[in-house]
Amino acid sequence: MLLPVFTLKLRHKISPRMVAIGRYDGTHPCLAAATQAGKVFIHNPHTRSQHFSASRVFQSPLESDVSLLNINQTVSCLGSGVLNPELGYDTLLVGTQTSLLAYDIYNNSDLFYREVSDGANAIVLGTLGDIAPPLAIIGGNCALQGFDHEGNDLFWTVTGDNVHSLALCDFDGDGKTELLVGSEDFDIRVFKEDEIVAEMTETEIVTSLCPMYGSRFGYALSNGTVGVYDKTARYWRIKSKNHAMSIHAFDINSDGVCELITGWSNGKVDARSDRTGEVIFKDNFSSAVAGVVEGDYRMDGHVQLICCSVDGEIRGYLPGTAEMKGNLLDTSVEQDLIRELSQKKQNLLLELRNYEESTKAELSSPLNEADGQKGIIPANTRLHTALSVNMGNDLQDAHAELGISTSNDTIIRAVLIFAEGIFVGESHVVHPSIHNLSSSLRVPITPPKDVPVDLHLKTFVGYRSSTQFHVFELTRQLPRFTMYALTSPDAASEPVSYVNFSVAERTQRMVTWLNQNFLLPEDSNVQNSPFHVCFTSLRNGGQLYIKMKQSGEITVNTDDIDLAGDIIQSIASFFAIEDLQVEADFPVYFEELRKVLVKVDEYHSVHQKLSADMADNSNLIRSLLVRAEDARLMRDMKTMKSRYMELYDLNKDLLNGYKIRCNNHTELLGNLKAVNQAIQRAGRLRVGKPKNQVISACRDAIRSNNINTLFRIMRVGTAPS
């Protein structure tokens, strides 16, 4: 069993996911963590006599080895690492919803302070791709920014939604690190500098990411799921009723391979094998785990796994020795093995008994329905599945439909469907009443997003009187654009919005792509020439037209810019296109974006006016306070009372102004998110280098406040020369 080598109990609360460790003087490892009231504490047990007198840092009145850093804002993320290689020691990075502070603890000074309009929800420090200096990369309101040690903005790009987690990892094995981004839209995106090279869709918000080794990384979701990916392939995942607060890679059993360490909301800490997800170590805190880090905290040459709880308890664990042979739990390996083998034995005996009973029944009498209760069904029984589109009626919305049927008179007693991102809890059970049993049933399916999904089916087949059933297991893939029904081009008007591009492919290959990605009726016959198909969205009734000329020119008409982006990305992936330039026009969406940009300007103006008013009021308060105190010292109580009444009124004005500032800031963030998403959508309409050029040019246009240029870039993909 693995026991902690040290335990500390600090009298400071620790905010969840806000723990970092660093050598802030180049020698001694110190813990930094966000605590209450907009402060960060630094625990330094190595130099207890050191006292700070800077304006930001002051000694904690509760503990001599804890110093407090005043941020005066709610801390939203915390990180540490070497930002300036010339200094030779770590820098503390503190992110809030409006700013990023790089603090030099050793010299008690700001390395830099930057206002970030998109906020900082997550932070990671390191080198990215070919960008030479180390960067402090923050993820905020649909945007990613990277700053060097001078605060220069060397990296910027947009992503699909609010960022919740970041990690650096050599994803493609080229010796250079890529940026992993987890966001609110359930996606894990991999950025090679500003280019997205891979996307993995999960089932909930991605709250944590951590590199393990090579291209392998761990992840955690807001629904209690943790798991491990190797590139785009998921190795394993488990789901708990508790929430994963922090994950970290650490070799806890000294086998040369990092395990995934998870700190949970119920106080449990466990280590799982990177290959199987098997628990090889666990411990419990009395409160939720706030963070998991590693460092040589005792300065004895051995790195410890350091776990912190929200109540301020800190425990350090040394990796297990070779003599422990990986046995880090209370129970012995032999006991676990015996228990596992006993369980397998019981399962096999039960299965053997069922086979013996079925064999006896077959020998004693011919097959009839009465024997069905013993679980006997004809040997040639087959299970058929079919996917189709149901346009719905007055009682039911339009949806995709999974049809399941047997090949004879056997009935389907129940169906279990496992699918990510479609059903609540990722599973769905269809269990008809005894009066409605038949050899076929239909299951409505409504995918919320346009992504391909594997449906794993377990179907219980038998007779009405059966007490035992045969279980048929099969997997069926739901095409990416399942929620679009093929309709006649003459049935509705063609959308005004469009994208236009050219590919060096035959129309026959386009038909193949169509069959793979849409649910087409069996009797449909899509012509190669002219290639012209029309679909209706089952979600909102919107129209989608896809046309292709013999020359390879493709036009997609739809008013949904997200759908157009998905279509282009799917076609580019199918035809293995690396670079694709696209001409696009979405008049309605662009007009909405123009209104948003006008609002952003208005909110910025209001923000500046409110800031100026607040500065004026602050000066007036200072003056009134001095006059009031002068009157008190001169025993002029009437004047003193008058001055304090004025101060009271001014204070009320300041509070009202603060509320207006808060509301203004919230509205501004919402509109900035819409702008960043618009740039992301414009980028998704292109592939490869044209995509990166569009995102970069759009940002330059917004910086220079050139709205007309911005819309031209979004339409044609390049800035005017």
Curated annotation (Swiss-Prot):
Which residue spans adopt a coiled-coil conformation according to this UniProt entry? 325-369
What is the consequence of disrupting this locus?
In mice obesity is associated with hyperleptinemia and resistance to the anorectic and weight-reducing effects of leptinan mice are resistant to the metabolic actions of leptin.
Write down the superkingdom of origin: Eukaryota
> Keyword Protein transport, does the record have it?
yes
According to its UniProt record, where is this protein located?
Cell projection, Cilium membrane; Cytoplasm; Cytoplasm, Cytoskeleton, Microtubule organizing center, Centrosome, Centriolar satellite
What's a GO biological-process term for it? hippocampus development
Please verify whether the record's keywords include Transport: yes
The alphabetized UniProt keywords are:
Cell membrane, Cell projection, Cilium, Cilium biogenesis/degradation, Coiled coil, Cytoplasm, Cytoskeleton, Membrane, Protein transport, Transport
GO cellular component labels: BBSome; centriolar satellite; ciliary basal body; ciliary membrane; cytoplasm; membrane; microvillus; motile cilium
- What cystine pairs are annotated? none
One GO molecular-function entry: RNA polymerase II-specific DNA-binding transcription factor binding
Q: What does this protein do?
A: The BBSome complex is thought to function as a coat complex required for sorting of specific membrane proteins to the primary cilia. The BBSome complex is required for ciliogenesis but is dispensable for centriolar satellite function. This ciliogenic function is mediated in part by the Rab8 GDP/GTP exchange factor, which localizes to the basal body and contacts the BBSome. Rab8(GTP) enters the primary cilium and promotes extension of the ciliary membrane.
How this chain assembles, per its entry, is:
Part of BBSome complex, that contains BBS1, BBS2, BBS4, BBS5, BBS7, BBS8/TTC8, BBS9 and BBIP10. Interacts (via C-terminus) with BBS7. Interacts (via coiled coil domain) with MKKS. Interacts with CCDC28B. Interacts with DLEC1.
The protein here is known as: BBSome complex member BBS2
| Source organism (scientific name) | Mus musculus
Q: What is this protein's gene name?
A: Bbs2
